[in-house]
Amino acid sequence: MFRVKVLVIFTLFATVAFAKNDSTAIFQGCSGGMMGHVGYLFGHPADATLPTGEKISPQGMTYGLGGSMRVHLWKHLRVGMEGFSSTMKSGVSDQHDFLQDGSYIRTGWGGVIADACWRLEKIWPYIGGSVGGGAMRTLSVVEGSQDDWLAEQVAVLHKQGFGYINPYLGMDYCITKRIHATFRLDWMLAFSNEQLVFPTGPRLYIGIMFCH
């Protein structure tokens, strides 16, 4: 009876140890952090109509902040989620002579991400993409000023949802084993049933990732 108990305990121990080793082979760690970005927002299509009759499609520099979290699986696969916010102000758009200060296009989006990463000594190049959705808020002030408390007579405020596919490539630079500087370039491909500006264009991200 004692031998049977020992055999059962040994078998259970071996099973748990094997499962642990197998899990370790699959799970290679995790990472997460924040990234700032700058990019260019293309207006598409050009049919946002103001009360004055003009059709506009603002384009210009956009900037913002966000972050991502990933689980590292097997040798190369990383999966996780991300979320970002980005703002284009009228002063850095091609409509700065037409739109008043205070006009902006603000975009927020988030989704799931997956990429392939090659863990070299100091450099970890990666390529992948994300899929998700978001919303874009557009404020176009044609007459008036943001410096007073008067009601604006000619302005448009609009909010629209969208879905997106976002291919990207980049690399991590291993500052230490736990801390990586990350650099990423992507191009958001947005789609929506509505006929206003879509948040389409390239962005360059720079940030810090904490790895475990």
What function would you assign to each model-found segment?
Residues 1-28:
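Cleavable N-terminal export/targeting peptides
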Residues 19-74, 211-212:
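Short glycine/proline- and aromatic-enriched beta-strand/turn motifs that initiate or cap beta-hairpins
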Residues 28-30, 59-65, 104-110, 123, ...:
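Residues that define the transmembrane beta-barrel architecture of outer-membrane proteins
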Residues 28-36, 77-81, 110-112, 125-131, ...:
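Transmembrane beta-strands of outer-membrane beta-barrel proteins
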Residues 41-49, 87-96, 144-152, 182-188:
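Flexible, solvent-exposed coil segments and beta strand-coil junctions
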Residues 48-55, 95-103, 150-157, 190-195:
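Extracellular loop and loop/strand-boundary signature of outer-membrane beta-barrel proteins
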Residues 71-149, 173-175, 210-212:
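Gram-negative (and chloroplast) outer-membrane scaffold detector with strong preference
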Residues 88, 165-212:
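Predominantly the C-terminal beta-signal and adjacent terminal strand-loop region
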